[in-house]
């Protein structure tokens, strides 16, 4: 892709998200979403092949449907209140439709079907953008409308997302699909706490982006897309193998790693609000996530697949890819739990 065109597209993606996050008018929110969606499609099609075209088409159709629902919610709210302002409380019907639109954009269950398919059809770098940056705009809208969100609807979608995120990843060998199902589960945790404590949702979002970015960086360093290709990491970089092991367990939410922190705080907050059944179900289904991450860890780091003698010598070759940015990401994505007393003061 031409560097000038690529820079323009990236700036448009950033601008679209910023317009959504800073706007106080519903029409400009919709415009921001459209800018973001139309600019991200060329990024998804960067590696031009039938698979990426299919993924881009699925993404476009899903996001266009969500934008249509968003506009419907805005018009219904305008009819009832006569207001375009985002700061005014939403009408109940408009709030439900808007919640469904944002759930579709985030990939929450039962609108999750596009996430694994789209992520599998694109490059790792495009998948990183899709599963991190593209979550910011819908999450900021949910954050702003949280006082009018229907609690039962949100909790139902959250529990379903955590369950499907766990079940879906169990039989996968493709790393991008595993990350997609993990993203669905993480979105479920974030939206579950939205109606109780939206600040905690932001904390969870930051940790999720940190963990996902680090994991994708590791995959990109090794050019790994399947469990088998990841299992050959020990040939190229033995130290990196140990790091991947730790990050995988952190993604699964195993204490005392960083990934455990948001789950712990969310369960604690929901119990404080006399909601015990929901966090119990979510904690049990989250074990499915931990299981497939532990299985991935086992096959990557604790077993040695049959390989030729030439394969065993790969560690002697110099790695031409820069790894300077990976070290701080690894530290933050594994060792952030001691920050929990400070973070609990932010509630």
Curated annotation (Swiss-Prot):
- The answer on whether this UniProt entry bears the keyword Transit peptide reads no
Q: Which EC main class describes this enzyme?
A: translocase
Q: What does this protein do?
A: Core subunit of the mitochondrial membrane respiratory chain NADH dehydrogenase (Complex I) which catalyzes electron transfer from NADH through the respiratory chain, using ubiquinone as an electron acceptor. Essential for the catalytic activity and assembly of complex I.
Would the keyword Transferase be found if you checked this record's keyword annotation? no
Give the reaction(s) catalysed.
a ubiquinone + NADH + 5 H(+)(in) = a ubiquinol + NAD(+) + 4 H(+)(out)
Q: How does it assemble?
A: Core subunit of respiratory chain NADH dehydrogenase (Complex I) which is composed of 45 different subunits. Interacts with TMEM242.
Concerning its family, UniProt says: Belongs to the complex I subunit 2 family.
Record's subcellular location: Mitochondrion inner membrane
Keywords in alphabetical order: Electron transport, Membrane, Mitochondrion, Mitochondrion inner membrane, NAD, Respiratory chain, Translocase, Transmembrane, Transmembrane helix, Transport, Ubiquinone
Supply the source organism's classification: Eukaryota, Metazoa, Chordata, Craniata, Vertebrata
Record InterPro entries: Complex_I_Subunit_2 (IPR050175), NADH_DH_su2_C (IPR010933), NADH_UbQ_OxRdtase_chain2 (IPR003917), ND/Mrp_TM (IPR001750)
Q: Its Gene Ontology biological processes?
A: mitochondrial electron transport, NADH to ubiquinone; mitochondrial respiratory chain complex I assembly
Catalytic activity, EC: 7.1.1.2
The name of this protein is NADH-ubiquinone oxidoreductase chain 2
Q: What is a single molecular function from GO for this protein?
A: NADH dehydrogenase (ubiquinone) activity
Per the UniProt record, which residue ranges are transmembrane? 1-21, 25-45, 59-79, 96-116, 122-142, 145-165, 178-198, 201-221, 237-257, 276-296, 326-346
Q: Which gene encodes it?
A: MT-ND2
Q: Which GO CC annotations does the UniProt entry carry? A: mitochondrial inner membrane
Membrane topology type, per the record?
Multi-pass membrane protein
């Amino acid at each position: 892709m031409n560097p000038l065109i690529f820079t323009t597209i990236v700036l448009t993606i950033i601008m679209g998200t910023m317009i959504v996050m800073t706007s106080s008018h519903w029409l400009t929110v919709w415009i921001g979403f459209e800018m973001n969606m139309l600019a991200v499609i060329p990024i998804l099609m960067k590696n031009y092949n039938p698979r990426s075209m299919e993924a881009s088409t699925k993404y476009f159709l899903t996001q266009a449907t969500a934008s249509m629902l968003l506009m419907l919610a805005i018009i219904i709210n305008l009819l009832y209140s006569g207001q375009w302002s985002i700061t005014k409380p939403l009408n109940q019907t408009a709030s439900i439709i808007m919640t469904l639109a944002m759930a579709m954009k985030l990939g929450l269950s039962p609108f999750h079907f596009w996430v694994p398919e789209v992520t599998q059809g694109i490059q790792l770098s495009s998948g990183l953008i899709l599963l991190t940056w593209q979550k910011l705009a819908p999450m900021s809208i949910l954050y702003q409308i949280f006082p009018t969100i229907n609690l039962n609807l949100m909790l139902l979608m959250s529990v379903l997302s955590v369950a499907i995120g766990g079940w879906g990843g169990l039989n996968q060998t493709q790393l991008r699909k595993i990350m997609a199902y993990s993203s669905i589960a993480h979105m479920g945790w974030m939206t579950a706490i939205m109606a109780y404590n939206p600040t905690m949702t932001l904390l969870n979002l930051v940790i999720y982006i940190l963990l996902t970015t680090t994991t994708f960086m590791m995959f990109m360093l090794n050019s790994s897309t399947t469990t088998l290709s990841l299992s050959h990491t020990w040939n190229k970089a033995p130290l990196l193998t140990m790091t991947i092991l730790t990050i995988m367990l952190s993604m699964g939410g195993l204490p005392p790693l960083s990934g455990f922190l948001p789950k712990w705080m969310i369960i604690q907050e929901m119990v404080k609000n006399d909601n015990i059944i929901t966090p119990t179900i979510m904690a049990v289904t989250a074990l499915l996530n931990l299981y497939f991450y532990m299985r991935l860890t086992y096959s990557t780091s604790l077993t040695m697949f049959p390989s030729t003698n030439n394969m065993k010598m790969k560690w002697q070759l110099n790695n031409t890819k820069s790894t300077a940015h990976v070290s701080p990401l690894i530290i933050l994505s594994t060792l952030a739990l001691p920050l929990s007393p400070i973070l609990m003061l932010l509630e």
